[in-house]
């Protein structure tokens, strides 16, 4: 049996402020730092170890992973970073308060932008200062790869490309893998692994800072999945209500 651990980064400063974050490189809040330390302690107490780790190129996911590995005394584990594990790009919504955006455009429209699989939010203009195509972390992107906006399908496409090329082969060679990433990135992976429909993924929430374990067979088909706490397995319905989605 193969085990894969997925974790959404700890609460970020913009999670706390209820802002659309996307590719904006926002750091963890104090609570997010605590969530990351707790996640590391949970994984260590439950006997987990890792051979390789994957994360995005955004500091909230990177820092979460660093803290987890530090808490587990696994700072030596190789870490691979890729923009393909970044959060969904929210286009012109990035930086905006979600409640204020709902008042401006209507709750139904904002819900469609956030939860539908194939509707993109308004795109950034190329002269928008939020369009960070010159950021050195993206210098290897081919022309046209840097998004102005994304729907969940766009995110899923790049995430699964990376999954099949990089992560799945590691799992198939019996490497113990942890992925520290983002809400929509992990939703994309869960949708793929569990064969969820577009409608099925709409209501899927991934809590910040709580390890999600997938037990997989030799073909990487899920046997079961569960969240972890200090006492071991915990089902989704028992996740603490205070967690910010």
Swiss-Prot record:
Site (Transition state stabilizer): 182
Pathway(s) annotated for this protein in UniProt: Carbohydrate degradation; glycolysis; pyruvate from D-glyceraldehyde 3-phosphate: step 3/5
Catalytic activity line of the entry: (2R)-2-phosphoglycerate = (2R)-3-phosphoglycerate
UniProt cross-references to CDD domains, sorted A to Z: HP_PGM_like
Entry annotated with the keyword Isomerase: yes
EC annotation from Swiss-Prot or TrEMBL: 5.4.2.11
Enzyme superclass (EC): isomerase
A Pfam cross-reference name: His_Phos_1
Zinc-finger in keyword set: no
Active-site residues per Swiss-Prot or TrEMBL entry: 9 (tele-phosphohistidine intermediate), 87 (proton donor/acceptor)
GO biological process: gluconeogenesis; glycolytic process
Keyword terms, alphabetized: Gluconeogenesis, Glycolysis, Isomerase
InterPro entries: His_Pase_superF_clade-1, His_PPase_superfam, PG/BPGM_mutase_AS, Phosphogly_mut1
A molecular function (GO) term: phosphoglycerate mutase activity
Residues annotated to bind substrate: 8-15, 21-22, 60, 87-90, 98, 114-115, 183-184
Family the entry assigns: Belongs to the phosphoglycerate mutase family. BPG-dependent PGAM subfamily.
Protein task: Catalyzes the interconversion of 2-phosphoglycerate and 3-phosphoglycerate.
Family annotation (NCBIfam families): pgm_1, PRK14115.1
Name of this protein: 2,3-bisphosphoglycerate-dependent phosphoglycerate mutase
Organism the protein comes from: Bacillus cytotoxicus (strain DSM 22905 / CIP 110041 / 391-98 / NVH 391-98)
